[in-house]
UniProtKB/Swiss-Prot annotation:
Cell wall formation. Adds enolpyruvyl to UDP-N-acetylglucosamine. The gene is murA. One of its GO terms (molecular function) is UDP-N-acetylglucosamine 1-carboxyvinyltransferase activity. The modification 2-(S-cysteinyl)pyruvic acid O-phosphothioketal is found at residue 126. Pathway: Cell wall biogenesis; peptidoglycan biosynthesis. This is UDP-N-acetylglucosamine 1-carboxyvinyltransferase. Keywords: Cell cycle, Cell division, Cell shape, Cell wall biogenesis/degradation, Cytoplasm, Peptidoglycan synthesis, Pyruvate, Transferase. It comes from Rhizobium meliloti (strain 1021) (Ensifer meliloti). The active site is at 126 (proton donor). GO terms for cellular component: cytoplasm. Phosphoenolpyruvate binds at residues 22-23.
Length: 430
């Protein structure tokens, strides 16, 4: 089993290209099930979750081809992937596939809209709280679907004439449920209005792609999204937007280790709140023609309080990384998680490196320390795993991170990108 070995103490200097966003690529790939034409996606990251979803889509009958080209001397892949779902051969998404990745549950929307039925296993993925599918089920039922849960599967059936446009207000903001209902509503009869919808850039990116396929969606990026149903969707070509979570992660890595790095092929507007928190922590941040420049030379890390919130608030997917940064601050910071319960599993592992963190409900109190010391640590989920890498960059000696398959789900060639900027990070196999 692979592990990541980090020897701390090196500053980061150079250029890091930012990959396409995993959180955008997954719903875009699933949207290919809505049409019998070819959907071509550019800038698709090479990640374990993407490969798993390719297998799932293939199970439904999608024909998938990949044209990869190496960029920057093998540093990363920017792949173009073609999806053609001319015939849906199965409307069942089995447990053995869906259990490995939560987002694969989202196929329920396109399958139900196009084929009138879907049988999808309840999902797996990161062990972050319960993350129930109630909102998906309630929303699809509002569009006229008959839904039953039996034997760990969600069985959904559309009315004889297809799904019916309706008004549905999410009781809480959900990116995944917004994705699913937006996709399902594109082929519904009539108009659907989604209230309290997620405003995340990935939702906007999906709507942009669906509109290119012939959908009629407006209001994306606001809390009210309107979808006028159409009879069918066509193929399209779409470029996946930059990964704002990867952008924020590497920005925090530079703030932690010190140095001067340009993050290429990304946009500051995708994560203004997070960048402002990093700036307040002591890093200098400026926009360049191709991305963002992060500099921290000499100045210490300042304590900053953050509260996670739906976009445009501080992203929950950057909470663990920011906690890693705060372990070396010059004071006390408070980090409050409002999106998911049980998303502090990284606290015990950071403590193994010498961090001083105490929990009270959904708030972590982080007392900055003058030094961290390398130790063996274990990744518990995707974002927690990279927080350990960030901490390891500033720790004295060697940090060995095990269970790095979590990292491979969401970070493309992380060790290579950091190494090219001067970090001592390597993948080792037992």
């Amino acid at each position: 089993m692979d592990r990541i070995r980090i020897v701390g103490g090196n500053e980061l200097h150079g250029v890091i290209p930012i990959s396409g966003a995993k959180n955008a690529a997954l719903p875009l790939m699933i949207a290919s099930l809505l049409t019998d034409d070819t959907l071509t996606l550019e800038n698709v990251p090479h990640l374990a979750d993407v490969e798993q979803l390719i297998r799932i889509l293939g199970n439904h009958g999608a024909d998938i081809s990949v044209n990869g080209r190496r960029e920057r001397q093998g540093e990363s892949y920017a792949r173009t992937v073609h999806f053609t779902s001319r015939n849906i051969v199965s409307t069942t998404a089995p447990y053995e596939l869906v259990s490995k990745m939560r987002a694969s549950f989202w196929v329920i929307g396109p399958l139900l809209a196009r084929e009138g039925k879907a049988r999808v296993s309840l999902p797996g993925g990161c062990a972050i709280g319960t993350r129930p599918v109630d909102l998906f089920i309630e929303g699809l039922a509002a569009l006229g679907a008959n839904i039953e849960i039996d034997g760990g599967y969600v069985n959904a059936t559309a009315p004889a004439g297809g799904l019916i446009g309706a008004r549905y207000v999410f009781p809480k903001v959900s990116v995944g449920a917004t994705h699913v209902l937006m996709m399902a509503a594109t082929l519904a009869n009539g108009t659907t209005v989604l209230g309290n919808a997620a405003r995340e850039p990935e939702v906007v990116d999906l709507a942009k792609c669906l509109n290119a396929m012939g959908a009629k969606i407006s209001g994306q990026g606001t809390s009210t999204v309107t979808i006028e149903g159409v009879r069918s969707l066509s193929g399209a070509r779409h470029r996946v937007l930059p990964d704002r979570i990867e952008t924020g992660t590497y920005a925090m890595a530079v703030a932690m280790a010190g140095g001067d790095v340009i993050l290429e092929d990304t946009e500051a507007s995708l994560l203004d709140t997070a960048l402002e928190a990093i700036r307040r922590a002591g890093a200098q941040i400026s926009e360049t023609n191709s991305g963002i420049r992060i500099v921290r030379n000499g100045a210490g890390i300042k304590p900053v309080d953050i509260v996670t919130d739906p976009f445009p608030g501080f992203p929950t997917d950057l909470q663990a990384q920011f906690m890693g940064l705060m372990t070396r601050s010059s004071g006390v910071s408070h980090i409050t998680e409002t999106i998911f319960e049980n998303r502090f599993m990284h606290v015990q592992e950071l403590a193994r490196l010498g961090a001083k963190i105490s929990l009270s409900g959904q708030t972590a109190k982080v007392e900055g320390v003058s030094r961290l010391k390398g130790a063996p640590v274990m990744a518990t989920d995707l974002r927690a795993s990279v927080s350990l890498v960030i901490a390891g960059l500033a720790a004295e000696g060697e940090t060995m991170v095990s269970r790095v398959y979590h990292l491979d789900r969401g970070f493309e060639r992380l060790e290579e990108k950091l190494t090219r900027c001067g970090a001592h990070v390597e993948r080792v196999s037992d």
